[in-house]
């Protein structure tokens, strides 16, 4: 079976060429770390990969495709593609890309670290689902100045292999009960900590971005977690196609004297499966113990005014205003959103 690394998609009478576009370089994205460490080219079954989790990710896809096609070369091509396309962990949301429920339910409902790509037959994204395996992923370690710090202001760097503007960034963090060794990264265990436009800036002298002299650098206040955690970074283009890029970043904080034992959380619940999914962005509670993990009102209020104004010019067709789509039967009317936005945007911007 032949696979094309590039594809042109015809959407809304627009031809859009999709190719590689970038990755997190600091802290380094999971798929980028595997690509840089190498070892995927020989032998074909991935035994030459020295990093334990990168090898497990490779062999997960290799064995899946081998079982499907009974062709070792096809299986190797699929697994190598997951490493080779480290700058194209992408998904297309269409003009409704600001609708969080649409994103969670239809665009990247599972396999978040793979940007939802879990089928080798789907061109150009392929199967990158090995990156979603729980396990002992190597983190970027950030030292703490004090064991009593509640957050750390850290400058993040995204290396664009192709520049896309206008655009904006979102950064999520796994919650305090997340266990990287047993849990999948799912929307239900993510908390939004950053949402804003980011200008291109010259890269620093310590940058590992070799694809571009300019990078997206932005400072994020990261809540301190006592155990290893994951940042989930979304780089979203502002256009009718709604192309977005999704990276999992493995991180840990280095305590000066180690965290107190009582502060370390060991999850005692069963890790949710990839199919155990519900939307966590509805305005209303559904009864029982259901509670919104990511509040959509505050999520929408966080969208920068420049994002809103730029988006409006693209959203005049098909009623594509903010929050106008349905999520689990809730109709979000534009007028209601506008009223909320005007009254509460400034107060909620720093949520």
From Swiss-Prot:
Name of this chain's protein: Spindolin
Disulphide linkage map: none
Entry-linked InterPro entries: Cellulose/chitin-bd_N, GlcNAc_Chitin_IntDeg, Ig_E-set
Function description: This protein is a spindle body protein.
One protein family per Pfam: LPMO_10
Transmembrane segments: none
Signal peptide residues on this chain, from the entry's feature table: 1-20
Quaternary data: Homodimer; disulfide-linked.
Keyword list, A-Z: Disulfide bond, Signal
Organism of provenance: Heliothis armigera entomopoxvirus
